[in-house]
């Protein structure tokens, strides 16, 4: 025994520890008991609230289901906590925990499956209504869902119109007054189709089916700014054309138009559009710029100089050898940028900024700084002109960046007595026609500019201010300046004809709805067709109508894959982020394509899924029939012959199809742009009686045909995808900026729309040396041919 150590001290320590443990266990058991009691009370409360819904005769709204699931999350968290301390539970409590876990699982399953189970019971209760009508399971569920906000994602050929029409009829069957229902379509033909279906299939002859145009007009009439006439989206491009014609004799306008046509030839790209910085630099390093004279030059500065000389009728040679210069081991044969043979003058355009630095992409991982190396080359070249007494005009890349290149060049040319002979206004416009042979391409951009400005609530004053204040590219500035002049004429024509345009009308209607909601008609049920096409102001108008009538419901049908009208102001995020606008919304996917053969569905699925901006879904074909997608390719390298080749092949194919098809079958010819359609249509003056239609892809949306020809699936400025429609020129009238990918994704959606018009045989036209990107993307589904087949394959 150790001297001085008492046994009482360790005993006291052990006793204290045991006492603390006993207290902690008691407190834990108390907490566990209270937690179990709380869980039981919560489950009992849930069961009480849900008791009236277990027979599925009453509908439990999404908000209440979400609240119930949040409460269950808390229950599961508590049960998880209790489960960690099973050893401290009494037998009775363990049995309660097991029972509560089962009850919580059951409640969660009930809430998660409620909509589906309710819908199936409602379908069963509505047998008399549905009868033998051919609806699939997803269509039936969409028709009977009773949520306040509903979105039906209806893929191409999935029975969208049939489902929407049935929803209107079903709502009436449930007791709604027809006048309390508002069904909205975007086109008159879609409105008429819905009316006819309601009357013929359901005996509803007085349905309130309208276009957005007629609804907006009715409400906008209450605005003091309203005028008698309203120009729709078909009339607006014609008014833009008239606006341009009024300015045709204006030399400044002609030069502005030419300036933009020249800028359209430039690809303004950003680094984020490339997989790596090196790929971005490679693009800048090796891209060529085409001039008005057809020559290819190495930079936009050289392009602008070449175009200026051409437009002022100054003869020049590009990179002509300076045979008089010294030969230097460090340099090849010296070839200055431009030589003016009539004057013996050379022009060098130096690729440096004000600090003497070259662009970053000049670097190729060399040990020598590229700016230093370039500077040495400049010194040697300048010395050659001094030594051999040759005249040299010098320009710089920073002048191009600062928009002073042409004024500086003009001044130096005049000082050297170079005669500048400017083109006449008509000659300038001829050059514009040469650069943009397809007028509908430019009209589409112009229409988009005005439409997007008004959709975003911008006036000409606002756009002018943005132009002064923002950091815009040269192309954006040139186009905005041009469009302000056209917009002024556009508004003058509207005023002269006592008209407003469609965007004005919607904006006026929205102002009325926000300030005088008491004057609005009350609708208990609002249904919208082609929801993917809705603009922000139209959506705000719908929200105002919903707010004007307590308890009103919204039912929308659309397809994010068919959002192709951004030029008219539609915003794809209105369908992608539907629940952000309408909380607790229900979503149903109609994923069966009843229109297209199996391989067309597979090809369209593949290309749609290449887009990043989309709803994830996989469309399945109802048909198991495999029909080849015929690809006609022009052979040879001479692309100037493509239009004539395509015209003859398409004419031959259409003639054969018309002769061999059944009387009730249709042929449809589609193109990204109208020009090849107009030429081909002249060959078939009786096309309507022949069951033949010629449509741009935009106009073809919502239609179908047994045989579809898609023209001009080629690359290039006027190809598909359109490389000339640089939507970044519209950034100045938008609230967000395009990043380049948005343009390609919409073009890809347009290709998807074209493919899915076809019920039987699909024919694509391309060039073997100028294939469209979309042809490359879908090539595994295509059957290449060199000559059209002359037999019609039965559906």
Language model region names:
Residues 334-356, 388:
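Active-site beta-strand-loop-beta-strand hairpin of nuclease catalytic cores
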Residues 27-227, 756-757:
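P-loop NTPase Walker
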Residues 310-330, 337:
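A short acidic/basic microdomain associated with nuclease active sites
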Residues 54-57, 180, 185-260, 374, ...:
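Conserved P-loop NTPase-based nucleic-acid remodeling module centered on helicase motor cores
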Residues 158-164, 273-278, 288, 584-586, ...:
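Helicase P-loop NTPase motor core
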Residues 663-664, 687-691, 695, 700-788:
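Conserved helicase C-terminal RecA-like lobe
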Residues 377, 382-383, 536-631, 725:
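Conserved RecA-like helicase ATPase core segment
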Residues 83, 101-156, 162-164, 182, ...:
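Conserved helicase NTPase motor core
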């Amino acid at each position: 025994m150790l001297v001085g150590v008492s046994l009482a001290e360790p005993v006291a320590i052990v006793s204290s520890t045991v006492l603390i443990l006993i207290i902690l266990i008691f407190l834990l058991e108390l907490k566990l008991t209270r937690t179990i009691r709380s869980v039981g009370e919560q489950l009992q409360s849930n069961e009480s609230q849900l008791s009236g819904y277990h027979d599925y005769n009453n509908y439990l709204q999404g908000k209440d289901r979400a609240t119930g699931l949040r409460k269950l999350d808390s229950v599961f968290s508590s049960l998880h906590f209790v489960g960690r301390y099973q050893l401290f539970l009494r037998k009775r409590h363990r049995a309660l925990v097991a029972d509560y876990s089962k009850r919580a699982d059951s409640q969660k399953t009930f809430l998660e499956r409620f909509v589906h189970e309710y819908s199936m019971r409602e379908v069963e209760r509505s047998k008399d209504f549905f009868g033998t009508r051919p609806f699939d399971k997803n269509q039936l569920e969409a028709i009977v869902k009773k949520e306040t906000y509903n979105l039906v994602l209806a893929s191409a050929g999935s029975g969208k119109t049939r489902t929407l029409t049935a929803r209107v009829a079903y709502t009436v069957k449930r007791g709604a007054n027809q006048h309390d229902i508002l069904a909205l379509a975007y086109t008159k033909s879609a409105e008429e189709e819905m009316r006819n279906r309601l009357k013929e299939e359901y005996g509803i002859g007085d349905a309130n089916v309208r276009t957005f145009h007629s609804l907006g007009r009715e409400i906008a009439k209450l605005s003091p700014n309203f005028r008698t006439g309203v120009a729709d989206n078909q009339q607006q491009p014609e008014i833009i054309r008239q606006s341009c014609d009024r300015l045709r004799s204006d030399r400044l306008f002609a030069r502005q138009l030419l300036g933009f046509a020249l800028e359209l030839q430039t690809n303004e790209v950003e680094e984020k559009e490339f997989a790596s910085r090196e790929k971005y630099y490679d693009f800048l390093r090796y891209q060529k710029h085409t001039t008005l004279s057809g020559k290819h030059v190495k930079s936009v500065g050289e392009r602008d100089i070449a175009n200026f000389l051409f437009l002022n009728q100054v003869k020049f040679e590009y990179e002509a050898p300076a045979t008089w210069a010294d030969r230097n081991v460090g340099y090849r044969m010296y070839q200055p940028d431009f030589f003016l043979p009539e004057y013996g003058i050379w022009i060098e355009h130096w690729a440096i900024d004000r600090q003497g630095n070259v662009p970053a992409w000049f670097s190729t991982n060399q040990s020598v700084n590229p700016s230093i190396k370039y500077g040495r080359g400049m010194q040697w070249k300048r010395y050659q002109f001094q030594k051999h007494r040759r005249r040299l005009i010098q320009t710089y890349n920073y002048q191009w960046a600062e928009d002073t290149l042409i004024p500086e060049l003009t001044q130096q040319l005049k000082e050297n007595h170079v005669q500048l002979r400017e083109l006449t206004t008509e000659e300038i416009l001829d050059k514009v026609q040469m650069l943009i042979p397809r007028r509908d391409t430019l009209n589409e951009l112009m229409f988009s500019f005005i439409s997007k400005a008004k959709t975003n609530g911008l006036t000409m004053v606002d756009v002018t201010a943005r132009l002064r204040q923002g950091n815009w590219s040269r192309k954006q500035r040139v186009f905005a300046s041009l469009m302000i002049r056209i917009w002024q004429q556009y508004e003058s024509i509207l005023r002269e004809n006592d008209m407003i345009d469609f965007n004005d009308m919607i904006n006026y209607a929205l102002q009325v709805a926000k300030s005088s909601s008491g004057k609005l008609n009350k609708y208990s049920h609002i249904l919208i067709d082609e929801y993917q096409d809705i603009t922000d102001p139209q959506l705000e108008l719908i929200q105002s109508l919903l707010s004007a009538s307590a308890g009103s419901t919204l039912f929308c049908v659309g397809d994010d894959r068919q959002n192709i009208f951004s030029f008219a102001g539609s915003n794809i995020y209105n369908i992608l982020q539907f629940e952000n606008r309408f909380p607790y919304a229900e979503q149903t996917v109609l994923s069966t394509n009843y229109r297209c053969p199996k391989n067309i569905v597979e090809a369209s699925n593949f290309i749609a899924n290449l887009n990043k901006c989309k709803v994830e879904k996989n469309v399945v074909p109802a048909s198991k029939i495999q029909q080849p997608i015929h690809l006609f390719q022009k052979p040879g390298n001479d692309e100037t012959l493509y239009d004539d080749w395509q015209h003859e092949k398409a004419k031959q194919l259409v003639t054969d199809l018309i002769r061999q098809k059944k009387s009730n079958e249709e042929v449809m010819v589609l193109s990204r742009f109208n020009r090849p359609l107009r030429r081909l249509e002249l060959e078939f003056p009786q096309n309507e009686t022949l069951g033949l239609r010629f449509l741009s892809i935009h106009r073809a949306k919502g239609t179908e045909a047994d045989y579809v020809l898609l023209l001009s699936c080629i690359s290039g400025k006027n190809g598909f995808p359109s490389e000339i429609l640089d939507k970044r020129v519209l950034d100045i009238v938008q609230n967000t900026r395009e990043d380049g990918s948005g343009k390609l994704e919409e073009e890809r959606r347009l290709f998807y729309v074209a493919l899915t018009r076809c019920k039987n045989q699909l024919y694509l036209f391309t060039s073997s040396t100028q294939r469209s990107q979309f042809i490359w993307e879908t090539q595994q589904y295509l059957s290449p041919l060199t000559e059209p087949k002359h037999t019609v394959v039965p559906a």
